[in-house]
Curated annotation (Swiss-Prot):
Family as reported in the entry's similarity comment: Belongs to the LDH/MDH superfamily. MDH type 1 family.
Superkingdom of the source species: Bacteria
Residues the record marks as active site: 177
InterPro entries cross-referenced by the UniProt entry: L-lactate/malate_DH, Lactate/malate_DH_C, Lactate/malate_DH_N, Lactate_DH/Glyco_Ohase_4_C, Malate_DH_AS, Malate_DH_type1, Malate_DH_type1_bac, NAD(P)-bd_dom_sf
Organism whose genome encodes this protein: Escherichia coli O6:K15:H31 (strain 536 / UPEC)
PANTHER family, per database record: MALATE AND LACTATE DEHYDROGENASE, MALATE DEHYDROGENASE, MITOCHONDRIAL
PROSITE patterns: MDH
Protein name: Malate dehydrogenase
Residues annotated to bind NAD(+): 7-13, 34, 94, 117-119, 227
Pfam family, one: Ldh_1_N
The keyword Oxidoreductase is assigned to this record: yes
Entry function: Catalyzes the reversible oxidation of malate to oxaloacetate.
Reactions catalysed according to its record: (S)-malate + NAD(+) = oxaloacetate + NADH + H(+)
Residue numbers binding substrate: 81, 87, 119, 153
Length: 312
């Protein structure tokens, strides 16, 4: 199994590469790519960690050598948020980066599963889909927006509030990956109940958690380490499913039946071909139903922005 990380010299990319080097199954290959000249050195640094995962790093304009034979491609390349910016302010720079890298994926490893981490995910996934479609290689079961950070944050905050072990809480999060489009389904967490005020406060905190980190880092960056962990969790789940493990379920932002929007984050059963089954979002509380209806315009606009970027 070969995993490629594009944007591997950045804050998320380095954290993700470290976690994959220590946690990928024995015999896996890990390939790091970034435009930054330091990237081969990041791979040498990680190569000293004693795990049975082969690692190589590549830099420069051409990602081809890193992508050859890749089964999974995780894309974290782009610029990070600064205080006062929201994820959509990143669009102008990151849209071009994602378009360029996905064009290279389409050419070199068109059958790979692709996980898009680069923000704004609501829009960059639509860009990736349109690029793959133009190249004639789009498979909607193999393109994912990685929203796992919303899930791990939800798990952490709920466990803190309710005095639970974080490992025993799993909150499904649906919708998109910014602001009001992030919808944690708190009504579906087994064995935990919330007051209306707790639901309102938790939902808001989960939606604004990225800003919490940006402000706390005071201009020094955005959420890189927790995002690295989230991306590793998703990437490792995908690898296990591709290798035939049964019953692997993760939420991610994918093209579905279009019931809510063309792309929508929901629980997915993963398998040997990527998405095996898009699972139902289940029964929502009145608060959740209302929040879902209220976010769809925003989500659809985010998606249209990405489609237009490629097709203009």
């Amino acid at each position: 199994m070969k995993v490629a990380v594009l944007g591997a010299a950045g804050g998320i990319g380095q954290a993700l590469a470290l976690l994959l080097k220590t946690q990928l199954p024995s015999g896996s290959e890990l390939s790091l790519y970034d435009i930054a000249p330091v990237t081969p050195g990041v791979a040498v640094d990680l190569s000293h960690i004693p795990t049975a995962v082969k690692i190589k790093g590549f830099s420069g304009e051409d990602a081809t050598p890193a992508l050859e034979g890749a089964d999974v491609v995780l894309i974290s390349a782009g610029v990070a948020r600064k205080p006062g910016m929201d994820r959509s302010d990143l669009f102008n720079v990151n849209a071009g980066i994602v378009k360029n890298l996905v064009q290279q994926v389409a050419k070199t490893c068109p059958k790979a599963c692709i996980g898009i981490i680069t923000n704004p995910v609501n829009t960059t996934v639509a860009i990736a889909a349109e690029v793959l479609k133009k190249a004639g290689v789009y498979d909607k079961n193999k393109l994912f927006g990685v929203t796992t950070l919303d899930i791990i944050r939800s798990n952490t905050f709920v466990a803190e509030l309710k005095g639970k072990q974080p490992g025993e809480v799993e909150v499904p999060v649906i919708g998109g990956h910014s602001g009001v489009t992030i919808l944690p389904l708190l009504s579906q967490v087994p064995g935990v109940s919330f007051t209306e005020q707790e639901v309102a406060d938790l939902t808001k905190r989960i939606q604004n958690a990225g800003t919490e980190v940006v402000e706390a880092k005071a201009g020094g960056g955005s959420a890189t380490l927790s995002m690295g962990q989230a991306a590793a969790r998703f990437g490792l789940s995908l690898v296990r499913a591709l290798q035939g493990e049964q019953g692997v379920i993760e939420c991610a932002y994918v093209e579905g039946d279009g019931q809510y929007a063309r792309f929508f984050s929901q629980p997915l059963l993963l398998g040997k071909n990527g998405v095996e089954e898009r699972k139902s979002i289940g029964t929502l509380s009145a608060f959740e139903q209302n929040a879902l209806e209220g976010m769809l315009d925003t989500l659809k606009k985010d998606i249209a922005l990405g489609e237009e970027f490629v097709n203009k």
